[in-house]
Regions:
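Single conserved hydrophobic/aromatic residue that forms the stacking wall/gate
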Residues: 2-13
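Juxtamembrane "helix exit" motif at the C-terminal ends of alpha-helical transmembrane segments
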Residues: 16-40, 115-141, 150, 154
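Hydrophobic alpha-helical membrane-associated segments
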Residues: 18, 22, 26, 54, ...
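Residue-level hotspots within the lipid-embedded alpha helices of multi-pass solute transporters
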Residues: 20, 49, 108, 112, ...
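Hydrophobic alpha-helical transmembrane segments
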Residues: 41-53, 134-145
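Polar-ligand-bearing catalytic/cofactor-coordination segments
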Residues: 46-53, 58-111, 159-213
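Accessory, usually C-terminal, subdomains that scaffold auxiliary metal cofactors
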Residues: 140, 146, 158-163
Length: 213
């Protein structure tokens, strides 16, 4: 009876390992070859940063061109529209949801992008203060710093998602732009699915769904 759940958790761990390997460890390994040409920590960190962002964007753009994934990303757009409708206090109907924006500041895509940016900043500071030449040791240090990076990212997204002002709107722009590749316009049937899913998790007590307060 526990087999499907165990299999599901295994898939989650595999995806997490893949993401860490592709977006964090691979750039570190590739940038290690820069050390053969220069002793500059700044140059090495800059190359690492460029590789991280380039790999992330290339992956997202490539995935978004896959037919089946585009359908998934349309459901993603329906989710965002439905949440916007709910947060505005409107009745959850297809008509009300359809006209809402498909980009949301608290999207997982934005979270992933901010994780990469925060990791770049944290790693730059740490390796500038405590230079590490061995590539495998650098990878271990980055893995050790990952909880800090994720924690900072969570608090950043929590603050940006919970406030509406020129500063937070500006900070949210990179993540919102990235959602051009991970959210597409849904059809009405997708919106109906999103509405049904949201209604199942709406708390009975008012205020229990407050975000960023």
């Amino acid at each position: 009876r526990d087999q499907p759940r165990s299999r599901g958790l295994g898939d989650v761990y595999k995806r997490q390992a893949f993401s860490i390997g592709l977006f964090m460890l691979l750039p570190t390994f590739l940038s290690s070859f820069v050390a053969l040409a220069t002793d500059s920590v700044l140059v090495r960190n800059l190359v690492d940063a460029v590789l991280r962002i380039a790999i992330f964007m290339t992956y997202m753009i490539a995935v978004s061109r896959m037919k089946d994934i585009r359908r998934v990303f349309s459901y993603h757009g329906a989710e965002h529209k439905t949440i916007f409708c709910y947060e505005k206090g409107l009745e959850l109907t297809v008509e009300n949801v359809r006209v809402q924006p498909k980009h949301h500041p608290r999207c997982g895509t934005s979270f992933m992008l901010v994780v990469i940016i925060v990791a770049i900043l944290v790693n730059t500071v740490v390796f500038a203060l405590f230079p590490v030449e061995n590539v495998f040791l650098r990878i271990l240090v980055q893995l050790a710093l990952l909880p800090l990076v994720v924690g900072i990212t969570y608090e950043f997204n929590r603050y940006v998602g919970g406030h509406d002002n020129p500063v937070t709107n500006f900070l949210a722009k990179p993540g919102l732009w990235m959602q051009n590749f991970t959210t597409f316009e849904p059809d009405d049937s997708m919106i109906e699915v999103a509405i049904t899913a949201l209604k199942l998790v709406i708390p009975e007590e008012k205020g229990k769904d407050a975000w960023g307060k």
